[in-house]
C-alpha cells in the first residue's frame, strides 16, 4: 500500500501530520488557506512540491465550501481577488521553497485570465481555479516518476558502467540521500527518493543510505520510514558519518542524490541544511552529486544562490527533541515527550537550508531529463523550458 501524505477528493483535504511520524499516523483536516498556512509553517506538511500542492488545494477547498453554501460572489473580479489574496498569504508560510511561490503565481495568472472574459461569473472563475489546482496533484506524481526513471538511467550509466565490482553487488550502486524527498514530500513517489525507488525496481540498487538530517530529523523520522515501508535495503547514518561512509570503499556509494527547494538559473541549489557539506564530500571522494527536482523548482528569475532567501527556524527545533518514551521490551512505546539536548543559555543559529554551488553538482534531474554542465562547467537550465 503506497504512502499517502496528501488525501484529497471533491473538495475535502487532509494531510498526514509528519510531526508524529514514524510513531503515529494522524491525518489533519485542512478547511482553509489559514489551516494550510499553519500546517506548512509548523512543518506538519513539508517538502517543496507537497507544500505547493497543499497550498493550492486549500484554496480550492474554501471555494468548494463557498459554492455549496451559496456564499460565493457572482462577480468574477471579486473571486479573482479573493483567490490571489489567499495565495499570496499562504506563500509567506515558507519563503525559501520556490514551488510555493511558483504555484501561487501560475494559479493567479489563470484566474486573472479567466476573470477577464466577457460575461464570466464568479463561479466560473472558481471552477477554473479548482480544475487547475486539482491537476497539480495529478501532474506531480507523473513528474516524479519521470524524475525517478531519468535519474536511475543516468546513475546506471555514469556511476555503475565501468565501476569496479564483484559478486552479488556487481552492476549495482549504493546511493546516499539527505532529508526527505519521497512520497511524504510530494504528491507521491518522490524526487530524490523516487530515483532510489526506480533503481531498486530496476534491480540496480545495492543499498540506500539516508542521513539523520539534524536538527529536524527528516531522514531518521521520514526517509527511513519510507525505505522500511517499501522494503528497500537501507541504513541510517548520522550527518557527521557521511565522510567516513564515502571513504569506506566496500559500501560502494557511487552517487549522492538530494532534492531541492529552489534551483537558481545558474544551477546553485538551496536544499536542506547539510546538503552543501555533502556536495563538498562528494567532490573530494569522486562520487557523483545529483539534484532531483521538477522544473517548477527551477527559478529562472533568480540568477544565483546569492539571491535565495534562507529561512531560519526557531532555536527550540535544535535544542529540543520530541518522541515517545521508550519502555521495557514488553511495554513498547509510551507517551510523547519533549526533552532538551543543549546547555541552557547557549546561542543558536538554525538555518533551514544552505546553498550548494553549481560547480559541485554533476547533474540536475528533471521530469524531462538530466541537465548536465557544458564544457565550460555551466548549466543552461533555460533549455528545460523550451
Curated annotation (Swiss-Prot):
The Swiss-Prot or TrEMBL record annotates one GO molecular function as: S-methyl-5-thioribose-1-phosphate isomerase activity
Q: What is its EC number?
A: 5.3.1.23
In terms of domain of life, where is this protein from?
A: Eukaryota
Record family assignment: Belongs to the eIF-2B alpha/beta/delta subunits family. MtnA subfamily.
Q: Which PANTHER family match?
A: METHYLTHIORIBOSE-1-PHOSPHATE ISOMERASE (PTHR43475:SF1)
Q: Enzyme group, top EC level? A: isomerase
Residues at the site labelled Transition state stabilizer: 179
Which catalytic reaction applies to this protein?
Answer: 5-(methylsulfanyl)-alpha-D-ribose 1-phosphate = 5-(methylsulfanyl)-D-ribulose 1-phosphate
Describe which pathway this protein belongs to, using the record's wording.
Answer: Amino-acid biosynthesis; L-methionine biosynthesis via salvage pathway; L-methionine from S-methyl-5-thio-alpha-D-ribose 1-phosphate: step 1/6
Location comes to: Cytoplasm; Nucleus
- Entry keyword set: Amino-acid biosynthesis, Cytoplasm, Isomerase, Methionine biosynthesis, Nucleus
Active site location = 261 (proton donor)
Matches recorded under HAMAP family: Salvage_MtnA
Protein name as annotated: Methylthioribose-1-phosphate isomerase
Pfam families per the record? Answer: IF-2B (PF01008)
Q: Name one GO biological process term.
A: L-methionine salvage from methylthioadenosine
Q: Look up the record and report any one GO term of the cellular component aspect.
A: nucleus
Q: What does this protein do?
A: Catalyzes the interconversion of methylthioribose-1-phosphate (MTR-1-P) into methylthioribulose-1-phosphate (MTRu-1-P).
Primary localization class, coarse: cytoplasm
